[in-house]
A protein has these predicted regions:
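Surface-exposed, charge/polar-rich loops and edge strands
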Residues: 1-295
Length: 295
């Protein structure tokens, strides 16, 4: 897989402090026109949240397209140069740099870009519908590669001064332009770090087309494995007493005596016990296919 030059728009640095891009998880439909933030990128992806919950497809697309065009006309966003860009994120104790690139969705369909978890089917369909309506990717898909097999030090390639830099919470985000040409790199495989539903949305648009999507590609050695919790509900017709027996088909299961000793393990809390699970060697080639969250 060769990284392609990103064909995208960049936010004007002087508007960074004024622009919002909230998650749909914290938005409701109880807005009046006066409460709508004028520089809110969610108006592109989900105009129905702010204007009317029951928009026709034509109304949805028109509102999204018109707002996007207004950002261009007002020079709040501008067309990027024909260069590669690097994205860097810094905290007090960690930093990592990734390559901003376009990739072909066919590489995901052919399993060259691999997920690390299964998705909610309904949410994947929702992302596909959004992309079909607005024809716009608001958030990149975050990938990583095994840098033990590729000699690529992204830290030495960017210019000293970022074209965009801002702080959000504990993190500083920077975008750098680079004169380096990364088109000769050939990734054998990439892995989805974040954006499983977004990439599935692209996959469902039209599998016959060479659809491109924007990604940020990080070296594996620089990525942090952060703790993440999920609450899993059993289907109504599933006998939960069989759960551990079913799980043992794929995993070695050990009970943890002390909760504090669970760092860097997959852990399940079930029926009052903390259980460490390790994937059996016979199933390592299956990847995420040994886990299925269903609908």
């Amino acid at each position: 897989m060769k990284p392609l030059l990103p064909n995208t728009y960049v936010i004007n640095n002087k508007y960074l402090q004024s622009i919002l891009s909230p998650s749909t998880d914290i938005i409701d439909y109880n807005f009046t026109p006066d409460q709508i933030h004028k520089l809110n990128l969610l108006q592109i992806l989900r105009p129905d949240i702010y204007f009317n919950k029951k928009l026709s497809e034509e109304e949805f697309y028109d509102l999204s397209r018109n707002y996007y065009q207004k950002l261009i006309n007002d020079q709040i966003i501008y067309k990027s140069d024909t260069n590669y860009y690097l994205y860097r994120i810094d905290s007090e104790d960690h930093s990592q740099t990734g390559l901003i690139s376009l990739l072909n969705i066919q590489d995901y369909l052919n399993n060259n870009i691999k997920p690390h978890e299964k998705i909610l089917v309904s949410k994947g369909k929702e992302r596909a519908e959004q992309l079909s309506k607005v024809k716009f990717q608001l958030c990149p898909i975050y990938l990583f590669y095994d840098d033990q097999n590729i000699d690529l030090d992204l830290e030495i390639h960017h210019e000293k001064k970022p074209i965009i830099k801002f702080k959000s919470g504990k993190y500083v985000h920077s975008i750098y332009k680079t004169q380096s040409d990364f088109s000769s790199i050939n990734f054998k495989e990439l892995f989805v770090a974040d954006g499983h539903h977004r990439i599935e949305g692209f996959a469902q648009l039209d599998v016959k087309k060479d659809t491109k999507f924007m990604a940020i590609i990080f070296p594996k050695s620089k990525c942090s494995n952060l703790a993440y919790n999920r609450s899993v509900k059993f289907p109504d017709n599933y006998a939960k007493d069989n759960f551990l027996n079913d799980l043992q088909k794929y995993f070695v299961i050990d009970e943890l005596k002390y909760h504090e000793n669970i760092d860097r393990f997959f852990v399940i809390y079930f029926q009052g016990k903390f259980l460490k699970i390790d994937l059996k060697k016979d199933y390592t080639s299956l990847g995420a296919d040994c886990i299925d969250f269903g609908e």
